[in-house]
């Protein structure tokens, strides 16, 4: 089943110039893509290529300058109030900058309950039980419930944001560089959790990343983005080989797991 369909999406930002006239900076140009239920897709690209802007459009934080985004066959621009509430539950996003994505004055308990209060019909006791359950799912315990964001490490706060997104049982989870910055142990745990959710609920995942190793370990399909456009799309096999210049640049930038010793035929 197709969850998300993007057709001919373009976007620009207007800013004032020295002449006082508004100038338009193009960020996305004619982007089209689809995401299906249970699918894991990577959006791969260098910083500044338009990945995060596309993500903000997909979750409805901004409206595109041109083109259409459809969720389960319905255009986002035409959703009524009830449909928009359902959409906000169905699609959740975890941002790279976790400290900016939460209220620093709120406790972890309040942060986790927030989407449940607005998007689900659960009693307070049920919300608290699910908050505890979600923390356990991301390898955190109840000891963090009364802490505030400044009291947590960056990795812990990122996991709290992931738990918050998962608390409403979304059909699509968008992770904007949200896993790449975790250490390898935490990253492996998150990947195991997401695979479990896919098997149980058919949750789809869109990884926005520049981490090619993450793509190879977890994703079924990869789209390479460059200068606001999709440069290529391909299935992820045993070994990725890109045809686009942008893809090859990212592939060549990956360091080997261990340093390669150079062999010399002569002793110095």
Swiss-Prot record:
Superkingdom, taxonomy of origin: Bacteria
Annotated Gene3D superfamilies: P-loop containing nucleotide triphosphate hydrolases (3.40.50.300)
Tagged with keyword Translocase: yes
Binding site for ATP: 45-52
Pfam family, one: ABC_tran
Keywords: ATP-binding, Cell inner membrane, Cell membrane, Ion transport, Membrane, Nickel, Nickel transport, Nucleotide-binding, Translocase, Transport
Subcellular location: Cell inner membrane
The ABC transporter domain, residue ranges: 4-252
Gene Ontology, cellular component aspect: plasma membrane
Statement: the UniProt record of this protein carries the keyword Zinc: no
Enzyme Commission numbers on file: 7.2.2.11
Transmembrane segment boundaries: none
Sample GO molecular function, one term: nickel cation binding
Membrane topology: Peripheral membrane protein
CDD domains assigned to the protein according to its UniProt record, in alphabetical order: ABC_NikE_OppD_transporters (cd03257)
Predominant location category: membrane
Subunit structure: The complex is composed of two ATP-binding proteins (NikD and NikE), two transmembrane proteins (NikB and NikC) and a solute-binding protein (NikA).
Function: Part of the ABC transporter complex NikABCDE involved in nickel import. Responsible for energy coupling to the transport system.
Family: Belongs to the ABC transporter superfamily. Nickel importer (TC 3.A.1.5.3) family.
UniProt-recorded name of the protein: Nickel import ATP-binding protein NikE
Organism: Shigella flexneri serotype 5b (strain 8401)
């Amino acid at each position: 089943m197709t969850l998300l369909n993007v057709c001919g999406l373009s976007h620009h930002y207007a800013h004032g110039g020295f002449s006082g006239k508004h100038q338009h900076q193009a960020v996305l140009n004619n982007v089209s893509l689809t995401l299906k239920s249970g699918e894991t897709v990577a959006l791969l690209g260098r910083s500044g290529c338009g990945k995060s802007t596309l993500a903000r459009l997909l979750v409805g934080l901004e409206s595109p300058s041109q083109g259409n985004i459809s969720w389960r066959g319905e255009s986002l621009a035409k959703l009524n109030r009830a449909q928009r509430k359902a959409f906000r539950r169905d699609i959740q996003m975890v941002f790279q900058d976790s400290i900016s994505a939460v209220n620093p004055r709120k406790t972890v308990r309040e942060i986790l309950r927030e989407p449940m209060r607005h998007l689900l019909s659960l009693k307070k006791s049920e919300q608290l039980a699910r908050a505890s359950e979600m923390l356990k799912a991301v390898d955190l315990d109840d000891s963090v419930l009364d802490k505030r964001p400044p009291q947590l490490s960056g990795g812990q706060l990122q996991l709290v944001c992931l738990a918050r997104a998962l608390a409403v049982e979304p059909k699509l989870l968008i992770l904007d560089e949200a896993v790449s910055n975790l250490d390898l142990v935490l990253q492996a745990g998150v990947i195991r959790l997401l695979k479990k959710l896919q098997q149980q609920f058919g949750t789809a995942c869109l990884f926005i990343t520049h981490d090619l190793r993450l793509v190879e370990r977890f994703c079924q399909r990869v789209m390479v983005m460059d200068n606001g456009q999709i440069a290529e799309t391909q299935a992820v096999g045993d070994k990725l080989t890109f045809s686009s210049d942008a893809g090859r640049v990212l592939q060549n930038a990956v360091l080997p797991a261990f340093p390669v010793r150079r062999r010399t035929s002569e002793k110095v």
